[in-house]
């Protein structure tokens, strides 16, 4: 008699995805972030669901309802901070997952990569709308500033912004629709994740060497299930340390002040995971130019398969490309730091230089170095 997991229509899908899946024998801990992102998504959906049971999306009561969750709901403070800091863990895993893909050339799986970029954009949109919901000062002004950027679009800009706002400013209608979108998007993300996995399982996983590993595959279970469980335990440990010891470490104190349209905070800035893009936006003195640079800073990821000039897939055996990759990482850290600084000398010029370097490395330096390394192979 054949095992039920191999014959049952539903179990068969799970079996081929998580149990009998042939996986390369040499994938490192950098391949753990896919499962960690899955866990992050589950944590966010569950905590979000329980928060939504007590939250009210009305400008008069939104701030109070969040306070009520933290003070009066059983373990409400825990749920709220797990959700807020869970988003930070989500983005840490996302950035590491994307960085892994860039380093080891995983972007040559065209469909998987492009759906991944769409997923990144969807998660960023969800996080932005979630940040607006507590209706604190930074929520309100963040929503005002970021939605206002759409007014830079020629001809339809102003109409588009007012349509998104549902009025002539960020108000009750905006908050209500942001709550609705923030609730539905994670489920759309879940569906996209399934498509992401579908395309990944068409080709199989990449591995650190970037070489075809068909001749040396091992079953996913028990080897990588155990490895993933270790990663998940470490993720939960880090999340709970953050939640229980310093829940407001990554937040903004301004968001503990209720939203006031008559009082602008001295420094409007988004959550830490958007600061690199915010720095690129601010580094261009023109509104439309800044918005284009902001969008391109993420969409440029879609160009990686086209810009790949090397004869080798992975950077494992390409020291010059490795060097440039880590300079790019350092540049992103610099942009993140600049995004949180006020708009004054010397931060303006540092931000502009870091933004230029970001695009130059990706569009020019990495492809050129790859071609040079191809020449070195012939020596």
Curated annotation (Swiss-Prot):
Bilayer-crossing regions: 33-53, 77-98, 113-133, 178-198, 226-246, 288-308, 320-340, 347-367
Which residues hold heme b b562?
A: 83, 182
Cofactor details (free text): Binds 2 heme b groups non-covalently.
For biological process, the GO terms are: mitochondrial electron transport, ubiquinol to cytochrome c
Q: Does the keyword rRNA-binding apply?
A: no
A Pfam family (short name) is Cytochrome_B
Q: Which cofactor does it need?
A: heme b
Q: Which residues hold heme b b566?
A: 97, 196
Kindly give the InterPro entries that the UniProt entry links to this protein: Cyt_b/b6_C, Cyt_b/b6_C_sf, Cyt_b/b6_N, Cytb/b6-like_sf, Cytochrome_b, Cytochrome_b_C_euk/bac, Cytochrome_b_N_euk/bac, Di-haem_cyt_TM
* One GO cellular component, as annotated: mitochondrial inner membrane
Keywords from the named record: Electron transport, Heme, Iron, Membrane, Metal-binding, Mitochondrion, Mitochondrion inner membrane, Respiratory chain, Transmembrane, Transmembrane helix, Transport, Ubiquinone
Please tell me whether the keyword Transmembrane helix is annotated for this protein. Answer: yes
Q: How does it sit in the membrane?
A: Multi-pass membrane protein
Give a short account of what the protein does.
Component of the ubiquinol-cytochrome c reductase complex (complex III or cytochrome b-c1 complex) that is part of the mitochondrial respiratory chain. The b-c1 complex mediates electron transfer from ubiquinol to cytochrome c. Contributes to the generation of a proton gradient across the mitochondrial membrane that is then used for ATP synthesis.
- PANTHER family xref list: CYTOCHROME B (PTHR19271:SF16)
Q: What else is known?
A: Heme 1 (or BL or b562) is low-potential and absorbs at about 562 nm, and heme 2 (or BH or b566) is high-potential and absorbs at about 566 nm.
Q: How does it assemble?
A: The cytochrome bc1 complex contains 11 subunits: 3 respiratory subunits (MT-CYB, CYC1 and UQCRFS1), 2 core proteins (UQCRC1 and UQCRC2) and 6 low-molecular weight proteins (UQCRH/QCR6, UQCRB/QCR7, UQCRQ/QCR8, UQCR10/QCR9, UQCR11/QCR10 and a cleavage product of UQCRFS1). This cytochrome bc1 complex then forms a dimer.
Family per record: Belongs to the cytochrome b family.
Its name, as the record gives it, is Cytochrome b
Q: What is the lineage of its organism?
A: Eukaryota, Metazoa, Chordata, Craniata, Vertebrata
Give the gene symbol: MT-CYB
